């Protein structure tokens, strides 16, 4: 049965006998944060959000992953793609940005952090599987959101979504987002969008992690299962 599953998943011809015939598919897959990530800009800061499911093939490797990674005091990134790739890139950018801040003797710009992600993702675009959203606050530009998808492009947006679950919520976010939302409205908007994606996307799930970044600092919160927004799901009537 396992051999049949491996062949069906495109892992090559199924071995007739031997240990490979009984190896589950997730043992040969890399750990992935196939996921839903999001960031929204408001007047005075940004809100970031992500689900917490990490998968290895069809196996859920971690239910409570933290995909909101601090890069500096008021700069965070949301990670999607290969867990190993995104963690390595985030660690490298954190290291470089720390030195840059020491040289300037002042907090780094969000644009600088996004540019470092862009340079690394573009330089190693053939080897990396990493889609990243960078968001934060700095004294020059205030709250900012940058998207760096796979391939190394960088674009500033009022809001950004990414990951496997994002394809299910483009219609919702386009119809719901409006300029001038408050921090509380952005938090609710982000939580609703993530909940909708987690309902439909098998690679997204767990809890919802949120972060609000402003001049005053970073406020983080976690929405557990009974706190996640609920939406009606279409079902067939009973026979």
Swiss-Prot record:
It catalyses: Cleavage of peptide bonds with very broad specificity. InterPro entries: Ntn_hydrolases_N, Pept_T1A_subB, Proteasome_bsu_CS, Proteasome_sua/b, Proteasome_suB-type. The active site is at 35 (nucleophile). GO terms for cellular component: cytoplasm; cytosol; extracellular exosome; mitochondrion; nucleoplasm; nucleus; proteasome complex; proteasome core complex. Transmembrane segments: none annotated. Residues 2-34 form a propeptide. The modification Phosphothreonine is found at residue 69. It is an enzyme of class 3 (hydrolase). It is found in: Cytoplasm; Nucleus. Keywords: Acetylation, Cytoplasm, Host-virus interaction, Hydrolase, Nucleus, Phosphoprotein, Protease, Proteasome, Threonine protease, Zymogen. The modification N-acetylalanine is found at residue 2. GO terms for molecular function: cadherin binding; endopeptidase activity; threonine-type endopeptidase activity. The 26S proteasome consists of a 20S proteasome core and two 19S regulatory subunits. The 20S proteasome core is a barrel-shaped complex made of 28 subunits that are arranged in four stacked rings. The two outer rings are each formed by seven alpha subunits, and the two inner rings are formed by seven beta subunits. The proteolytic activity is exerted by three beta-subunits PSMB5, PSMB6 and PSMB7. (Microbial infection) Interacts with HIV-1 protein Tat. Induction: Down-regulated by IFNG/IFN-gamma (at protein level). Up-regulated in anaplastic thyroid cancer cell lines. One of its GO terms (biological process) is proteasome-mediated ubiquitin-dependent protein catabolic process. Its main location: cytoplasm. Belongs to the peptidase T1B family. This is Proteasome subunit beta type-6.
